[in-house]
């Protein structure tokens, strides 16, 4: 029987860490990993959207994961997103991830061409076959991938004993209930703005792109939701988190550029900027980041101490 409790908790999506030349910084990767260990998160989701994976080469993605694992192995649950445009490269990353001892691999569906469900299932199962001793998680993010998971496709995938569930980043909370009803053993809430709703609907844990900027806030929401002792407080804290997210997105630069500045302001390691074509911080964005950092600290002081 698999131990699925390791997936129950707050799992920040790990950010790309670059040096002054824009190359992967192994040192910054290790430092950021330790930062999250010290914050008390359950795990890390490495190589996903928040990690700018689609703008990185296969060797770069390997290097980043290797340095996460140097620090995190045995301390955090590590889920490695391994999808590439092609099946061959995705399988290469899957095999590499398993060799490092990750807890699970994950994959979006094939992008650009709209493929039938049978082709999507084959893509996922081929990737899973390259990591035969590792859990597999479907990443459902239709607003970016261009294709949505459906009950029939999930049923097909659950015939693969390694497929344990879904990282669900579609917006309806209803989808979380749907995948649970379909037999998924593990379902992660994806949209950060609906963490509380996702947990109340039965999500096992949560993976989010803004969790890394304010892990204390999301850890408290998770604690309150799972205990059921003070849902009013959880709801108020979720509303604060949403307002901070909206402010993060109000700048001219990409949200992840904003988050990296917020991390610096909050004492986290300097992990560089974002990789083009993602838009870097623009004049005026630093003030927004400072305001977000102040709001995060205020929420922590009010709810998390």
Residue ranges of model-derived segments:
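Catalytic alpha/beta core domains of metabolic enzymes, predominantly
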Residues: 129-134, 141-242, 248, 252
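C-terminal alpha-helical cap/extension of soluble enzyme domains
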Residues: 6-17, 39, 200-203, 210-305
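Active-site beta->alpha loop and helix N-cap motifs at the rims of alpha/beta catalytic domains
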Residues: 2-148, 263
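A short, hydrophobic/aromatic-rich structural module that often spans a beta strand
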Residues: 93, 100, 188, 293-296
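Short secondary-structure capping/turn micro-motifs that flank functional sites
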Residues: 52-53, 113-114, 174, 196, ...
């Amino acid at each position: 029987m698999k131990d699925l409790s390791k997936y129950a908790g707050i799992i920040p999506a790990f950010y790309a860490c670059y040096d002054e030349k824009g190359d992967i910084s192994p040192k910054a990767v290790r430092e950021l990993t330790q930062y999250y260990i010290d914050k008390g998160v359950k795990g890390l989701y490495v190589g996903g959207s928040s990690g700018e994976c689609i703008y990185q080469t296969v060797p770069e993605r390997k290097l980043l994961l290797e340095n996460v694992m140097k620090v995190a192995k045995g301390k955090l649950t590590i889920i490695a997103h391994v999808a590439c445009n092609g099946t061959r490269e995705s399988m290469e990353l899957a095999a590499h991830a398993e060799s490092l001892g990750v807890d699970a691999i994950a994959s979006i569906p094939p992008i650009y061409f709209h493929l039938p469900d049978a082709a999507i299932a084959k893509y996922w199962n081929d990737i899973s076959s390259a990591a035969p001793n590792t859990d597999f998680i479907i990443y459902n993010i239709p607003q970016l991938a261009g294709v949505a998971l459906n009950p029939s496709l999930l049923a097909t995938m659950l015939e693969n004993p390694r497929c344990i569930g879904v990282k669900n980043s579609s917006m309806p909370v209803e989808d979380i209930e749907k995948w649970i009803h379909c037999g998924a053993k593990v379902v992660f809430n994806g949209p950060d703005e609906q963490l509380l709703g996702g947990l109340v609907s039965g999500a096992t844990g949560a993976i989010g792109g803004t969790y890394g900027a304010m892990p204390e806030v999301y850890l408290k929401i998770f604690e309150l939701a799972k205990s059921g002792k003070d849902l009013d407080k959880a709801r108020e804290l979720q509303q604060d988190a949403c307002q901070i997210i909206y402010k993060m997105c109000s700048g001219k630069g990409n949200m992840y550029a904003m988050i990296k500045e917020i991390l610096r302001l909050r004492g986290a390691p300097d992990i560089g900027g974002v990789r083009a074509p993602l838009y870097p911080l623009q004049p005026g964005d630093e003030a927004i980041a400072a305001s977000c950092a102040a709001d995060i600290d205020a929420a922590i002081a009010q709810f998390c101490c």
